[in-house]
Amino acid sequence: AVCVSLLGASSIRPLPLHLGQFNNMIKCTIPGSTPWWDFSDYGCYCGYGGSGTPVDQLDRCCQTHDNCYTEAQKFSGCSPYRRKYSYECSEGTLTCKSDNDECAAFVCNCDRLAAICFAGAPYNSNNVDIDLEARCQ
């Protein structure tokens, strides 16, 4: 069983630094969660890409986050998927630090608002790994 576990773990791609930060922001607002597993294949917008009508409130959080990243890309040289930023988590409260440049501050705020949104949205396991072609038009 240990070998299977180790082999399974070796096939998981590591998160880029910034997405690791987003992952940790979600853990701050939802203690005990496993964001990469819980949200990476949820609804029409949580995970890579996105299209159609969000299936619920949580999926709308992801759509808003996607749109925020699109806005971040309008800053010269700003790549939200790779941008490192400074933030603080204190007792479930997220704060983007003032030493971030314009791009980092924007991306940090995208992630902060999404993490807060996730924490306030119900999680419906029926919306995990859905048929994107049928439900996301």
From Swiss-Prot:
Bound cofactor: record note: Binds 1 Ca(2+) ion.
Ligand binding (Ca(2+)): Y45, G47, G49, D66
InterPro entries: PLipase_A2, PLipase_A2_Asp_AS, PLipase_A2_dom, PLipase_A2_dom_sf, PLipase_A2_His_AS
Residues in the signal sequence: 1-17
CDD domains with a match to the protein in the record: PLA2c
Function: Snake venom phospholipase A2 (PLA2) that may act in the hemostasis system of the prey. Exhibits hydrolytic activities, and prefers the anionic micelles (dPPC with deoxycholate) (54 umol/mg/min) to the zwitterionic micelles (dPPC with Triton X-100) (15 umol/mg/min). PLA2 catalyzes the calcium-dependent hydrolysis of the 2-acyl groups in 3-sn-phosphoglycerides.
Name of the protein described by the UniProt record: Acidic phospholipase A2 PL-II
Originating species: Walterinnesia aegyptia (Desert black snake)
